[in-house]
A protein has these predicted regions:
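Structural motif
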Residues: 17-28, 38-40, 82-87
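C-terminal accessory module of base-excision DNA glycosylases/AP lyases that mediates lesion recognition
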Residues: 1-20, 24, 117-122, 132-192
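Short alpha-helix boundary/capping elements
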Residues: 39-43, 56, 100-103, 146-147
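Short, aromatic/basic-rich helix-turn unit that serves as a nucleic-acid recognition element
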Residues: 30-34
Length: 192
């Protein structure tokens, strides 16, 4: 694996502190990806910072050990952390349990110990809340923003635009506009 670099932040939220947290705490990045569905990128990736504010930490083992009803209440506190706070509380708790159990409570190990690209993808896919498209996008972010490119990275890296290409607020706006246009085209095709 090439040497891991660390960007100053990932410009996904519009909030400097939340953007820095995505870089400073690897679990925050994973939680952001888990939350990235049916809400804006900004809402999904600001979730880890708000969760940390509410809990006082982002420790995978501690989150995994929480009473599910208590975590659910934290997610539902206004403003809710997600459009579907109950479901996402469960996903994040399962994600944290996997990080704690399978990666020694160190989210960075998910990628830092992957010997090759296919293993990196398999490790990401093993995490609750991370499906195929999210894994590909995470691979792109790790490769393009953190220089995490183990042997065989090119075999699993996406060839389409992803959050890995977002390095500024302008790039995020362009990415989101492209994603909306793609979804509109798919809907139009489905109407036939």
């Amino acid at each position: 694996m090439r040497g891991m670099t660390t960007p100053a932040s990932l410009p996904f939220t519009g909030n400097d502190a939340a953007d820095r947290l995505l870089v400073d705490e690897p679990l925050a990045l994973l939680i952001g990806f888990a939350l990235d569905q049916q809400v804006t990128v900004q809402k999904a990736f600001s979730g880890p910072a708000e969760l940390k504010r509410r809990l006082g930490h982002l420790d995978a083992a501690r989150i995994a050990a929480m009473d599910p009803d208590e975590l659910n209440a934290v997610f539902r506190e206004r403003p809710a952390l997600h459009r579907f706070p109950g479901a996402m509380a469960g996903k994040v708790q399962a994600l944290c349990a996997a990080v704690s159990r399978d990666f020694g409570n160190d989210a960075r190990r998910v990628w830092s110990e992957a010997p090759d690209g296919p293993s990196l993808e398999a490790r990401l896919l093993s995490l609750p809340g991370i499906g195929g498209m999210k894994a590909k996008s995470l691979i792109a972010v790790l490769g393009k923003q953190f220089d995490v490119r183990p042997p065989g990275y090119e075999d699993v890296a996406p060839t389409w635009p992803t959050l890995g290409d977002v390095d500024s607020a302008e790039a995020l706006a362009s990415y989101q506009a492209g994603k909306r246009a793609h979804k509109a085209a798919l809907r139009e095709t489905a109407r036939g």
